[in-house]
């Protein structure tokens, strides 16, 4: 058994857990980390990057189980404890998920073939950072204080923003949080709605990718590496979710804008100056 490989899986799980729900592109950081460590083969890294996100999204389900269960019951029965509009959150999440499902299933292969490039990733990191600065410096009147207050029209618009996350370097969390802030959703509600919106998208993508490409996992050690990364991402994401909600309840997202821009500039320098190409 390759101990170094298992340690690398732990590091990759930590990277995923920290970055998944921050508006900074977790996929970009995972691929950069894999490249720096020489982690696994290209085909296995591609699968790992998608499936390890399942651990992070399980942290959301675990931490918000009561609210998610109430939202599901509200959607199915029209009754939910503590909700004035029981079906609102469930319907809003469904509406917000539809655009990315349509665009993703239609153009996913083309996007990966033509846009999976370090220059594209760097540019989208920088643009995303600038957009965070823009929405933070031009706050809109708050129309939704909690995730349960997000209306169907607002949810659809957030869902359209989520489609931008199909472009490498954009960040699903970044696109949905920026979109929500732009539309007048509070910082806390923007973050939590983004958490919830990731459940169908990430679970669906992880299961689909695992079913399609499970043949690249050729040994029990491969499955162990994937399992370790997923478990570690769950534990780390659980902590980071709570820290992020506490952070945005008191502060803004500008620190993440700076992080995106700095990372984007470094990737541009690596690509233009040293011919860096992303392994994914």
From Swiss-Prot:
Organism of provenance? Psychrobacter arcticus (strain DSM 17307 / VKM B-2377 / 273-4)
The record's keywords, sorted A to Z, are:
Antibiotic resistance, Cell inner membrane, Cell membrane, Cell shape, Cell wall biogenesis/degradation, Hydrolase, Membrane, Peptidoglycan synthesis, Transmembrane, Transmembrane helix
Q: What is this protein called?
A: Undecaprenyl-diphosphatase
Q: How does it sit in the membrane?
A: Multi-pass membrane protein
Which is a GO BP term held by this UniProt record?
Answer: cell wall organization
Recorded superkingdom: Bacteria
> Main EC class of this protein?
hydrolase
Q: What is the additional note? A: Bacitracin is thought to be involved in the inhibition of peptidoglycan synthesis by sequestering undecaprenyl diphosphate, thereby reducing the pool of lipid carrier available.
């Amino acid at each position: 058994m390759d101990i170094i490989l298992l340690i690398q899986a732990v590091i990759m799980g930590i990277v995923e857990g920290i970055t998944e729900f921050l508006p900074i592109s977790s996929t970009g950081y995972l691929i950069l980390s894999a490249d720096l460590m020489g982690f696994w083969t290209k085909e296995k890294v591609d699968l790992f990057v998608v499936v390890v996100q399942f651990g992070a999204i399980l942290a959301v389900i675990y931490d918000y189980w009561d609210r998610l269960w109430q939202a599901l019951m509200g959607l199915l029965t029209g009754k939910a404890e503590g909700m004035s509009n029981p079906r609102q959150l469930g319907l809003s999440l469904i509406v917000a998920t539809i655009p990315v499902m349509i665009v993703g299933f239609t153009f996913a292969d083309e996007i990966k073939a033509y846009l999976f490039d370090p220059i594209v990733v760097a540019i989208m990191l920088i643009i995303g950072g600038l957009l965070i600065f823009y929405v933070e410096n031009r706050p809109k009147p708050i129309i939704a204080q909690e995730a349960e207050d997000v209306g169907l029209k607002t949810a659809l618009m957030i869902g359209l923003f989520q489609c931008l996350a199909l472009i490498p370097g954009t960040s699903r969390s970044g696109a949905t949080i920026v979109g929500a802030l732009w539309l007048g959703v509070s910082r806390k509600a923007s973050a939590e709605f983004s958490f919830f919106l990731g459940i169908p998208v990430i679970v669906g993508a992880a299961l689909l990718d695992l079913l399609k490409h499970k043949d690249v996992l050729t040994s029990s050690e491969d499955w162990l590496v994937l399992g370790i990364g997923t478990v570690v991402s769950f534990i780390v994401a659980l902590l980071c979710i709570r820290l992020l909600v506490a952070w945005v309840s008191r502060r803004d997202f500008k620190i993440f804008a700076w992080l995106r821009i700095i990372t984007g500039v470094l990737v541009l320098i690596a690509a233009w100056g040293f011919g860096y190409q992303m392994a994914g």
